Amino acid sequence: MRTTYIAKPGEVERKWYVVDATDVPLGRLSSAVASILRGKNKPTFTPNVDTGDYVIVINAEKVALTGRKASNKVYYHHSNHPGGLKARTAGDYREKDPEKLLALSVKGMLPKGTLGRQQAKKLHVYRGADHKHEAQQPEVLDINKLI
């Protein structure tokens, strides 16, 4: 009888991937990136161990928002002071802070808790085509083949 393989945190091998977000719908990109961050693309996936890889997303400012999401999708946060509810649309985020728009979208698709926060730290988002992780020799990943 065979036993199920359970990954241990010390023996996980991690890769670096580069994903180009140009004209890719935000939700489809986020779900594919979240899957890689969790490690669900590996045969050694274990739900309670961080088996995921590092992901670098470039050209975040060129991500596609389909339909009327640029004006109708609203992100809320509160400053914990009376009357401190802040609201920004997805279009505002795409113009002013596209890195945060993509990070919020991916973070919402990761587990809630310490493991999800640990996995979210492996995401690196950049506005343009340049990034500072060339030393890690990242592998280019075509996101259209994953969706």
Curated annotation (Swiss-Prot):
It comes from Ligilactobacillus salivarius (strain UCC118). The keyword Ribonucleoprotein applies. Belongs to the universal ribosomal protein uL13 family. GO terms for molecular function: mRNA binding; structural constituent of ribosome. Coiled coil: none annotated. This protein is one of the early assembly proteins of the 50S ribosomal subunit, although it is not seen to bind rRNA by itself. It is important during the early stages of 50S assembly. One of its GO terms (cellular component) is cytosolic large ribosomal subunit. This is Large ribosomal subunit protein uL13.
